[in-house]
Amino acid sequence: MSNTVRFSAPLETAFIEEGYDPAYFVAVTGESGEQIAGYELARRLELGKRRGFGSIKVEVRVGGSKWRTSLFPRKGGDGWFLPLKKPVRLAERLIEGDEIAVELTLL
């Protein structure tokens, strides 16, 4: 199984609490989400436990930006959330609704 996942998805927002900036993320669903779920299951079987909150460590490339973060499972098992921090959004000039090409390396 390849540890690299490539996909495109829109930048979305979620309001966590009134008075705070929204959280920005990309939803990883469909075939890409299933590939990641298979990887997470194999790691859990190998190690005998899950990481905190069921997260998966990844290295991300969006445009010219590259960083490490974690993916988090969506409720109901329907894919994963990839959070995008403000410095990345500013560097890549991303706004809500933009279609983003993402490359993930599962760590």
Model-derived features: where do they sit?
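Long, compositionally biased stretches
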Residues: 1-78, 103
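Short, compact, well-ordered microdomains
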Residues: 68-105
